[in-house]
Amino acid sequence: MIQLVGPGGAGKTTIGAALAKRLGARFSDLDAEFTARCGDISAYLDANGYEAYAEQNVGLYFDLVDGPVRLDIMALSSGFMTYEDGIHPDYFALRQRLASSPATFVLLPSVKVEACVTEIVRRQLRRPFARSAEREEQVIRQRFVAYVGMSARKVETMQPVEAVVAELIAALAGGRQG
């Protein structure tokens, strides 16, 4: 299964849906699945806290990948690769597997921190559930190092969606190129 990871606003859902359409594949967005099963993510966080959300989200991931419907492409939640190791009994091994899989792609507007932060904040503030610019900047700065530190291939998304899709298809066809 192809898995797209990265911060909120990196383009995981848009690019995942376009990639699925181009490949005739099945696409799932973990945030959309969470919302369908558990309700609004912000409300869930307010009522239960981040740790409960992360635990539920990892459990949902396993339910989906182990379920009866085969998934070809999945966009993971923005913080999925940054949860605490003990959040779920199988999370540490899963995170290690995802980080090193040739079918996992880290989507970032740029691999340069300042360009990435600026673009993520700009994109996130256009969303209806956006936090303040300061909070969005804090979140991406905290998570950026984790994303660029993953051994999975990084794909910059400050280009047309079709160009990103073409890059993903080429990488999948040719193996991992770093």
Q: Can you describe what each PLM-predicted range is?
A:
Residues 77-81, 110-112, 160:
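Short glycine-rich anion-binding loops that position phosphate/pyrophosphate groups of nucleotides
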